[in-house]
Swiss-Prot record:
The keyword rRNA processing does not apply. Residues 20-46, 74-115 are annotated as: Disordered. The modification Phosphoserine is found at residue 9. InterPro entries: PPDPF. Probable regulator of exocrine pancreas development. Signal peptide: none annotated. Residues 22-32 have a biased composition (Low complexity). It comes from the Eukaryota. Residues 106-115 have a biased composition (Polar residues). This is Pancreatic progenitor cell differentiation and proliferation factor.
Amino acid sequence: MAAIPSSGSLVATHDYYRRRLGSSSSNSSGGSAEYPGDAVPHSPGLPKADSGHWWASFFFGKSTLPFMAAVLESPEHSAESPQASRSPISCGLAPETMKKQPVMHPSQTNSRAPS
């Protein structure tokens, strides 16, 4: 059987990673003040997380990247459905290669029985 770690070790691991990421909130063991120069430096080319939960924008639709907002608001994308476009994706193949192969849509079924 696999050993299940105690809750104390899980809390210690969580506390360690909070300090490594430079969290400003304090906890019972002293918070990030014990490690003043240990925070991961912020790169000037990347957007800053506002609440410490960097993943929140993925779930709640808050776009922090300006180029994504420009793509989503462009007029060429507004007429199409947001799910998928009807044009085939070339994936770097030559145009003549794409013309030779039939385009299969998910709604089409295979009418031949396997032999």
